[in-house]
């Protein structure tokens, strides 16, 4: 009488830490913060690690000139348990846990895994194979205001965003059922990077003359967006420890 869910699930743990500082003078204000989040999931081999930082600064250089600087950074590392059943990753593991018969044992008396046509999800979890996802993002902006004359202000600002992502899914060759041939081990990797640049120049005039007012705005905007993407796949690696793309059989490569 096998309880598949009890055999697989664990208690997830989350811890979070933050440090913030702020201060300044009459002409300068600043704020900075850093944070860390660590989390383990309810399935073995599932976890998340996040680091983030942010800083803001406002400066009155002169009575007419002000500068604003903002920067932020965040990095996430995810691990998700992988399955050997045609993709699906942890979703496939959860599906198997919910449909397997309680008449099938997790382990046989001889220590081998209980056999099913679709695979044994506990064997997948015990192998330690994971889907690894990495993402980092940086955002920075700078703005300068200058009061040219009474009512006339110029603002120049620019910003930059860069986002980097890496996906890696290695499927091990697991011989858990002697009566059924194992699929070859395989590796899929995806690399994505995008960046965006913005530039703005504004000239604002706002003046009241008695009962009349005049508002005029002139502006210029420029933007650039770059994207780079690469996907690779190979099979038949010499062993389950050498999970680098160059080690797979070149004849099986797809891009």
Where do the PLM segments sit?
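Surface-exposed loop/interface segments of Gram-negative outer-membrane beta-barrel transport/assembly proteins
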Residues: 1, 41-48, 52-139, 155-255
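Residues embedded in well-ordered regular secondary structure
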Residues: 1-44, 82-85, 121-132, 144-147
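Outer-membrane beta-barrel channels and translocator barrels
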Residues: 14, 25-26, 62-66, 147-149, ...
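An active-site-proximal structural segment forming one wall of the substrate-binding cleft
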Residues: 152
